[in-house]
From Swiss-Prot:
InterPro entries: Ribosomal_eS31, Ribosomal_eS31_arc, Ribosomal_zn-bd. The lineage of its organism: Archaea, Methanobacteriati, Methanobacteriota, Stenosarchaea group, Halobacteria. This is Small ribosomal subunit protein eS31. The keyword Endoplasmic reticulum does not apply. The gene is rps27ae. The keyword Metal-binding applies.
Length: 44
């Protein structure tokens, strides 16, 4: 996924950022959101 697809038309992030890392977006999975940098996971 290209970097520009993370942002909406206003230039703001469409996805949530990691609460641990702060500078990493969480990957969207069917049943969870996951940070690939630190391993943080939020279950839906």
């Amino acid at each position: 996924m290209p970097h520009n697809e993370y942002y909406n038309d206003d230039g703001e992030l469409d996805r949530e950022t990691c609460p641990r890392c702060g500078d990493t977006v969480l990957a969207e999975h069917e049943d969870r959101q996951h940070c690939g940098k630190c391993g943080y996971t939020e279950w839906k």
